[in-house]
């Protein structure tokens, strides 16, 4: 992996899914993160209200700090409506991802899993598959897991087939980055807690013969 594009429905998904990888490869690969939607207005009856718009700016600021802590300086925010991507024409999302692939020319793309309970994640997954057709420059496409979403997809469980080993420092860096999203974390047993993040890393390591790991599913291509 030399140029890696991470596609996230909302700010914080990128850290939850790929934070350890970002830490481990920060000096070995070039990364860009694309945020398709904002992550807050689904909590408001009127998404266009001033308070909701301030929350979007706040959360985008969290994302910048989190990514900078992991050495990532390439990112962009499209701020489509959170929780409402099912009302957004699929082609609009497709075009966003196609545009970013053309601009960045990645060899590897990470995106959401189609097993997630979150419908926005499904829309982003579908758009990624369309935008990374076999004739594109992308050599491999992988999906990642997002705590508080992937594990709730009870009808269609996430079945990883790629495990990326992480050091203790990588796991700590992942948590430290997630902490910038101060409105999105809580105490254990909430999944997006320090213990939750570290427990999942340990479990994925147990599955793959490592002390810690992040899990992915290879959708297309070779490693």
Walk through the language-model features, giving the residues of each.
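Metal-dependent de-N-acetylase/amidase catalytic core
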Residues: 1-7, 24-28, 53-54, 68, ...
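A short, flexible beta-alpha/helix-coil linker loop
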Residues: 39-41, 80-83
């Amino acid at each position: 992996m030399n140029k890696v594009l991470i596609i996230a429905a909302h700010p914080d998904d990128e850290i939850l899914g790929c934070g350890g990888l970002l830490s481990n490869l920060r000096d070995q690969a070039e990364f860009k993160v694309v945020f398709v939607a904002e992550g807050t207005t689904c909590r408001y009856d009127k998404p266009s209200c001033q308070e909701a718009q301030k929350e979007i700016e706040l959360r985008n600021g969290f994302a910048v700090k989190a990514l900078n802590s992991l050495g990532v300086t390439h990112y962009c925010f499209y701020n489509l409506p959170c929780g409402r991507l099912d009302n957004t024409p699929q082609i609009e999302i497709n075009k966003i991802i196609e545009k970013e692939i053309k601009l960045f020319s990645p060899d590897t793309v990470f995106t959401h899993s189609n097993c997630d309970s979150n419908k926005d994640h499904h829309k982003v997954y579908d758009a990624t598959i369309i935008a990374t057709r076999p004739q594109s420059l992308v050599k491999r496409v992988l999906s990642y897991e997002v705590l508080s979403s992937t594990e709730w997809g009870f009808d269609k469980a996430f079945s990883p087939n790629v495990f990326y080993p992480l050091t203790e420092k990588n796991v700590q860096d992942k948590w430290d980055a997630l902490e910038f999203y101060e409105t999105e974390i809580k105490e254990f047993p909430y999944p997006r807690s320090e213990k939750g993040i570290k427990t999942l890393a340990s479990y994925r390591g147990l599955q793959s013969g490592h002390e810690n790991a992040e899990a992915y599913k290879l959708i297309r291509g070779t490693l």
